[in-house]
Amino acid sequence: MMKKYYESDADLSVLSGKKIAVIGYGSQGRGQSLNLRDSGLDVIIGLRKGKSWDAAAKDGMNVMTVAEAAKKADIIQILLPDELQAAVYKNEILPHLSENKVLMFSHGFNIHFGQIQPPGNVDVIMVAPKGPGFMVRRQYEEGKGVPALIAIHQDHTCKAHKTALAYAKGIGATRAVVLETTFREETETDLFGEQAVLCGGTASLIKAGFETLVDAGYAPEMAYLEVCHELKLIVDLIYEGGLTNMRQYVSNTAQYGDMTRGPRVIGPEAYEAMEEILAEIQSGEFAKEWMLENMVNRPVFNALTKADEEHLLEETGKEVRAMMPQFRK
């Protein structure tokens, strides 16, 4: 059973007098830093000059270079894309990572796969909200919170756990629930979820269903509505109460088809593929592949992205959404 923590388990005063540098101002960077600031904490933003710098300044944040932020901060939260973290850490953070500082992440990729290897005289922790940055911010503003994971990789000061919980409280996570995990578990399950179910599995299932209907002569608009547009309605029901809840709201015909035909779509071959995907993650094969892909300017990534953007599914989706007032800007 995972350990769980709530508001009363975390002490925000642990961060009193501490300067927190958030490196990056994308979705998570913005959401977390604004919440920390509104929780009364001392936050600075480390960035390179550009749109993110301007956005952070417009939000009233104290913005400076990454190196300046790392030098001034007691706690350094790296919220850059995985593929950029190692270089920024080596060139702009490590020179200022003095004893007893705290190095923090919201995903364990670079620590777990050895892309970043911190010195032994600092704390290394993770606070990972289980939701996108805009939702972290929205829930906080509504007096709620997005659940989060915490993990301790290195506890030089013997205060790492309290620091992680305090930070989680600062971004509003303890209003929901904070669960304790490890860098390994968070990294491997997160990557697997993205690849096999949430992004890869779902996207491939939608495209396969769409293509099957269109190839059989059905209108692309009908195919889109049935296999993509309506998916949100089903996912919302599952999110609210699991598969059982979803099945209480669909027809008996739909439920019977679900239980008898679904396993034919996701059958033994799918399980074998999932096991292979998990093994590639666990061995570090995927991480190595992704790092190499970035070293050669992402030829596979760019080609696959372009192909999906030009897929009939995407063109049809634009046309269908244009018919509906709620999607008109």
Curated annotation (Swiss-Prot):
UniProt: substrate binding residues: 251
Cofactor annotation: Mg(2+)
Residues covered by the KARI C-terminal knotted domain: 182-327
Active site: 107
Lineage: superkingdom: Archaea
Enzymatic reactions: (2R)-2,3-dihydroxy-3-methylbutanoate + NADP(+) = (2S)-2-acetolactate + NADPH + H(+); (2R,3R)-2,3-dihydroxy-3-methylpentanoate + NADP(+) = (S)-2-ethyl-2-hydroxy-3-oxobutanoate + NADPH + H(+)
Pfam families membership: KARI_C (PF01450), KARI_N (PF07991)
Keyword Coiled coil applies: no
PROSITE patterns linked: KARI_C, KARI_N
Function of the molecule: Involved in the biosynthesis of branched-chain amino acids (BCAA). Catalyzes an alkyl-migration followed by a ketol-acid reduction of (S)-2-acetolactate (S2AL) to yield (R)-2,3-dihydroxy-isovalerate. In the isomerase reaction, S2AL is rearranged via a Mg-dependent methyl migration to produce 3-hydroxy-3-methyl-2-ketobutyrate (HMKB). In the reductase reaction, this 2-ketoacid undergoes a metal-dependent reduction by NADPH to yield (R)-2,3-dihydroxy-isovalerate.
Cross-referenced HAMAP family: IlvC
Name of the featured protein: Ketol-acid reductoisomerase (NADP(+))
